[in-house]
């Protein structure tokens, strides 16, 4: 067997395998002889059909069978001869069985890139830290209180903390705009849910009154087309309701599944820490891996990108269907190519680092990671753990997370790391 390798664009390769024609002919004769014993052709007794007739009638089908058989028997050895591992099953692009001496076929495929990891010590990485303050805890407790607060309609003028039911219409240059009006809209004064000046302008107003506010959208408003625009809001006050007194006592705590306020505060702080750690972990992980991918440029197999894009597309469809949304008119698969390329590249980098540093994961590490993740599932934590324990193959995704964390720690140990302090609200909003 002779092999001839050609490098195509990027990671694509073309491999031609030459074999003695006798191999092809012998296999062809064997198949035709077997067919001659089995086929029924008018004018001939079964088992007595001449090979020449069988070749003429069924030669094309037999030819395909022989080619597939030869490829299956020889391709693995041919790839080993050129020391290449394809990303996916090679595709046959050319077959030549007409020569008197040789039978040849050509396959094309992609190979994995050769990756030499850049020196971690040359990476400058910023990591985020968050301290949870007493004020953060109080604000979170206030949020729990808001969830249970009941309101009672009153006839007096509005004050901070009241809930108003309003109709409003926003006008820019005398014209309405998308999202600029609503009926029976509920707003609690002082919560900062509207642009600056809106809630302030509704303090000390009477029931059934009409208020006109001239305001300006902030320059960093999330809708670019409205940013920095002057706007006039015409507002009708339909109802003013004051909050009923709500005591932070044992009854309050039990509504959140705790026996008393001390237990509720402890549980609340634990959940705050879990939430912050999860968000910071994601933020810091991205910061590390973004630097890693930037410092290690290389071509990524297109086949792997296409597969990952398909997975992302399918995941989006599943989420939409689960939420009862229509999948008609959704974005094309190609819209996921950039994210797919990032994920594939990162996966190749993590695998290479894992091999370079001979990283291994124990079952204890996997179980500890599983327990850590389960904390985000609240009362369903044990159910989540049981799901993974029922089928050991499900733990492969947890194992990958452990390896990724080991790689992160390796990089941080050697890189130039700076820390940025952020507030609890910045991370959780």
UniProtKB/Swiss-Prot annotation:
Organism's domain of life?
A: Bacteria
**Compartments, as annotated in UniProt:** Cytoplasm
Any GO CC annotation of this UniProt entry: cytoplasm
Catalytic activities: [protein]-peptidylproline (omega=180) = [protein]-peptidylproline (omega=0)
GO biological process: what's one of them? chaperone-mediated protein folding
Q: Does the keyword Phosphoprotein apply?
A: no
Chief location of this protein? cytoplasm
Q: What is its EC number?
A: 5.2.1.8
The PPIase FKBP-type domain, residue ranges: 161-246
Instruction: List keywords of the entry alphabetically.
Output: Cell cycle, Cell division, Chaperone, Cytoplasm, Isomerase, Rotamase
Q: Which GO terms describe its molecular function?
A: peptidyl-prolyl cis-trans isomerase activity; protein folding chaperone; ribosome binding
UniProt family annotation: Belongs to the FKBP-type PPIase family. Tig subfamily.
Entry's HAMAP family?
Trigger_factor_Tig
Q: What is the documented function of this protein?
A: Involved in protein export. Acts as a chaperone by maintaining the newly synthesized protein in an open conformation. Functions as a peptidyl-prolyl cis-trans isomerase.
- Free-text note regarding domains: Consists of 3 domains; the N-terminus binds the ribosome, the middle domain has PPIase activity, while the C-terminus has intrinsic chaperone activity on its own.
Q: Can you name this protein?
A: Trigger factor
The organism is: Vesicomyosocius okutanii subsp. Calyptogena okutanii (strain HA)
Species classification: Bacteria, Pseudomonadati, Pseudomonadota, Gammaproteobacteria, Candidatus Pseudothioglobaceae
Originating gene: tig
């Amino acid at each position: 067997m002779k092999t001839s390798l050609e490098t195509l664009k990027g990671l694509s390769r073309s491999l031609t395998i030459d074999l003695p024609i006798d191999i092809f002919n012998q296999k062809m004769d064997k198949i035709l002889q077997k067919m001659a014993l089995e086929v029924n052709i008018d004018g001939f007794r079964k088992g007595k059909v001449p090979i020449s007739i069988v070749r003429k009638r069924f030669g094309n089908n037999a030819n395909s069978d022989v080619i597939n058989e030869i490829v299956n028997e020889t391709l693995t050895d041919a790839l080993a001869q050129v020391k290449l591992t394809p990303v996916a099953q090679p595709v046959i692009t050319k077959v030549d069985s007409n020569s008197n001496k040789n039978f040849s076929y050509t396959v094309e495929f992609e190979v994995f890139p050769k990756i030499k990891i850049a020196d971690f010590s040359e990476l400058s990485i910023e990591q985020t830290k968050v301290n949870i303050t007493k004020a953060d805890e109080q604000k979170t407790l206030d949020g729990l209180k808001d969830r249970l607060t009941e309101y009672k309609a009153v006839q007096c003028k509005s004050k901070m903390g009241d809930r108003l039911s309003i109709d409003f219409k926003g006008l820019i240059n005398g014209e309405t705009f998308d999202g600029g009006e609503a009926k029976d809209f509920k707003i609690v004064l002082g919560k900062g849910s509207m642009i600056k000046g809106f809630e302030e302008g509704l303090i000390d107003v009477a029931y059934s009154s009409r208020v006109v506010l001239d305001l300006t959208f902030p320059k960093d408003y999330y809708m670019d087309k409205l940013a920095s625009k002057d706007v006039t809001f015409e507002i009708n006050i339909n109802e003013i309701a004051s909050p009923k007194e709500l005591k932070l006592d044992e009854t309050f705590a039990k509504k959140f599944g705790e026996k008393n306020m001390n237990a509720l505060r402890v549980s609340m702080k634990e959940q705050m820490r879990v939430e912050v750690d999860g968000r910071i972990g994601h933020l810091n992980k991205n910061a590390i891996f973004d630097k890693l991918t930037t410092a290690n440029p290389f071509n990524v197999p297109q086949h792997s990108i296409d597969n990952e894009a398909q997975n992302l597309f399918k995941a989006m469809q599943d989420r939409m269907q689960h939420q009862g949304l229509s999948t008609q008119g959704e974005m094309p698969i190609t819209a996921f190519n950039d994210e797919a390329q990032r994920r594939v590249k990162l996966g190749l980098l993590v695998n290479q680092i894992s091999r370079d540093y001979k990283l291994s994961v124990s079952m204890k590490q996997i179980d500890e990671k599983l327990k850590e993740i389960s904390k985000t599932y609240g009362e369903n934590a044990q159910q989540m753990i049981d799901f993974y324990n029922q089928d050991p193959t499900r733990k492969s995704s947890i194992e990958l997370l452990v390896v990724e964390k080991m790689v992160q720690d390796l990089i941080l140990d050697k890189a130039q790391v700076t820390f940025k302090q952020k507030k609890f609200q910045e991370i959780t909003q």
